[in-house]
Amino acid sequence: KGVTHLAAAAFFNAIWDLISKFHKKPLWRYIIELKTRDLLDKLSFSYIDDVITKDEAAKIIDQKKTNLPSNLDDLNSTIFPAYTTAAGWLGYSDEKMKGLVEENLSKGWTHFKMKVGQDIERDIHRCKLVRELIGHENKLMVDSNQIWSVNETIENIGKLKQFDILFYEEPTNPDDVLGFKKIKDAHPDVNLATGEMIQNKVMFKQFIENKSLDYCQIDSCRIASI
């Protein structure tokens, strides 16, 4: 856990990088082109095989592979969804936020994430400003960086829902599986996001099994490698 996993990630991710360079192809392509069983043999199912077995994982992967283009080179021209936080940092004036939102809209951005958590009334004002600028055809997300308690999260989500938030990222302590469940039970119609601070697969198992995680934000260093 923690530092141990970060240290392991430095080693294992470097090996993956070497494998990629040896085969003269990007790592994503090397992984996609692996036979399903070869890929699964590189993974450990310890502590999670009570919710997903290697055979079940194989079926999922094989099903997903049917959606791949016949020519993987086509993926090089595919635009994958991404978001920008450039306009949403705390401390920005309304004028600066407006300018940055308009600038990023002109560059083609359609998904915007903003930081919240210092003052809920200011958060409401800022969300209203950004939503009006980007319209309802674009997506808005918020990240409170774990600052709220469970009860504060439940209350504040109730105040921010009017702005059609795609997901609420790390609204409370990222280790609090039961807390996320309480939030989800209070607001079953909203999406919760977390994962960049989760250190192991068992935590992910708990979040996913109790249906309190909608957007899984994996950090390939914190969990000891890809």
Regions found by a protein language model. Name each.
Residues K1-L140, N145-I154, G158-Q162:
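N-terminal capping/lid subdomain adjacent to the active-site entrance of alpha/beta enzymes
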Residues K113-I226:
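Catalytic core of soluble alpha/beta enzymes
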